[in-house]
């Protein structure tokens, strides 16, 4: 499998998931239909999104790590899949929820070769490969902000930081793409307990890095050794090369 195959598969999945979600009334999306492998309730919207995605991925020689079903398949290519990132938004009609896929030649993020995020509500498509990162087919880069008095997304605003604006959209994959295309200058998820799982963030991290961003753990360590595994959790500090060290110093 190469980048072209991954893009083809991702686009097919995005189309099918979007159709599945669009056909569901909001009152149906919100119903609990079981418990996911991650230990959280599965909404009807999650179930139909994952079913649509897995129907396509089962035709490929891949190992899939996904929120609801866990680890599936035994292929040489690993796929971190979140078929519906931003479930709450999807159940309320808030237009920030995405399908997210990251493809890797091993079970580690450092061997990823393709990332894909598709906003199911707006139709905006983000992907990255060896040539760079793209939004709706156009190259994107992170912002060139140099000062902390900047726009930021932060999940743990208990302390007073000198940011001009803070936003929380409820979809890490989409938010990392907002960082990647320069809409926001930073992305931080510094919640205690490392609430993000690998399938939440892998594609967004890959896209952000290919757009020129620096993305690390709280201690500045690379995310490259994070595994495509249900137990893998992470915090994220993402900014451009100039802002990143300032953010790390600030949140110590």
From Swiss-Prot:
Pfam family, one: Inositol_P
UniProt: Mg(2+) 3 binding residues: 38, 40, 67
Gene Ontology process terms (BP): inositol metabolic process; phosphatidylinositol phosphate biosynthetic process; signal transduction
Annotated positions binding substrate: 85-87, 167, 172, 191
Gene3D superfamilies per UniProt: 3.40.190.80, Fructose-1,6-Bisphosphatase, subunit A, domain 1 (3.30.540.10)
Cofactors demanded by this protein: Mg(2+); Mn(2+)
Protein name: Fructose-1,6-bisphosphatase/inositol-1-monophosphatase
Cofactor binding mode and count: Magnesium. Can also use manganese.
GO molecular function, one term: metal ion binding
General function of this protein: Phosphatase with broad specificity; it can dephosphorylate fructose 1,6-bisphosphate, both D and L isomers of inositol-1-phosphate (I-1-P), 2'-AMP, pNPP, inositol-2-phosphate, beta-glycerol phosphate, and alpha-D-glucose-1-phosphate. Cannot hydrolyze glucose-6-phosphate and fructose-6-phosphate. May be involved in the biosynthesis of a unique osmolyte, di-myo-inositol 1,1-phosphate.
Annotated binding of Mg(2+) 1, by residue: 67, 82, 84
Regulation: Both FBPase and IMPase activities are inhibited by Ca(2+). In contrast to mammalian I-1-P phosphatases, is only very weakly inhibited by Li(+) (with an IC(50) of about 290 mM).
Catalytic activity as recorded in UniProt: beta-D-fructose 1,6-bisphosphate + H2O = beta-D-fructose 6-phosphate + phosphate; a myo-inositol phosphate + H2O = myo-inositol + phosphate
UniProt keyword annotations, A-Z: Carbohydrate metabolism, Hydrolase, Magnesium, Manganese, Metal-binding
Lineage: Archaea, Methanobacteriati, Methanobacteriota, Archaeoglobi, Archaeoglobales
Family from the record: Belongs to the inositol monophosphatase superfamily. FBPase class 4 family.
EC number: 3.1.3.11, 3.1.3.25
Binding-site residues, Mg(2+) 2: 82, 85, 200
Subunit structure of this chain's protein: Homodimer.
SUPFAM superfamilies membership: Carbohydrate phosphatase
Top enzyme class: hydrolase
PROSITE patterns, per database record: IMP_1, IMP_2
Keyword Phosphoprotein listed: no
Keyword Nucleotide-binding: no
């Amino acid at each position: 499998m190469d980048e072209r195959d991954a893009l083809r598969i991702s686009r097919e999945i995005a189309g099918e998931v979007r159709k599945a979600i669009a056909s569901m009334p909001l009152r149906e999306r919100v119903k609990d239909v079981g418990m996911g492998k991650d230990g959280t309730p599965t909404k009807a919207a999650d179930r139909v999104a994952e079913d649509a995605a897995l129907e396509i991925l089962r035709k490929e020689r891949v190992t899939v790590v996904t929120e609801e079903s866990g680890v599936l398949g035994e292929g040489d290519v690993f796929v971190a899949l979140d078929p519906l990132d931003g479930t709450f938004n999807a159940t309320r009609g808030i237009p920030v929820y995405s399908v997210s896929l990251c493809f890797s030649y091993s079970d580690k993020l450092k061997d990823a070769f393709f990332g894909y995020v598709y906003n199911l509500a707006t139709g905006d498509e983000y992907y990255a490969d060896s040539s760079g990162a793209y939004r709706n087919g156009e190259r994107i880069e992170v912002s060139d902000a140099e000062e902390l008095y900047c726009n930021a997304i932060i999940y743990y605003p208990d302390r007073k930081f000198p940011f001009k604006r803070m936003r929380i959209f409820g979809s890490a994959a989409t938010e990392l793409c907002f960082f990647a295309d320069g809409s926001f200058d930073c992305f931080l998820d510094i919640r205690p307990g490392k609430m993000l799982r690998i399938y939440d963030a892998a594609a967004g991290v890959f896209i952000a890095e290919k757009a020129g961003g620096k993305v690390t753990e709280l201690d500045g360590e690379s995310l490259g050794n994070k595994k495509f595994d249900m137990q893998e959790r992470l915090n994220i500090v993402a900014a451009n090369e100039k802002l990143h060290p300032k953010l790390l110093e600030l949140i110590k």
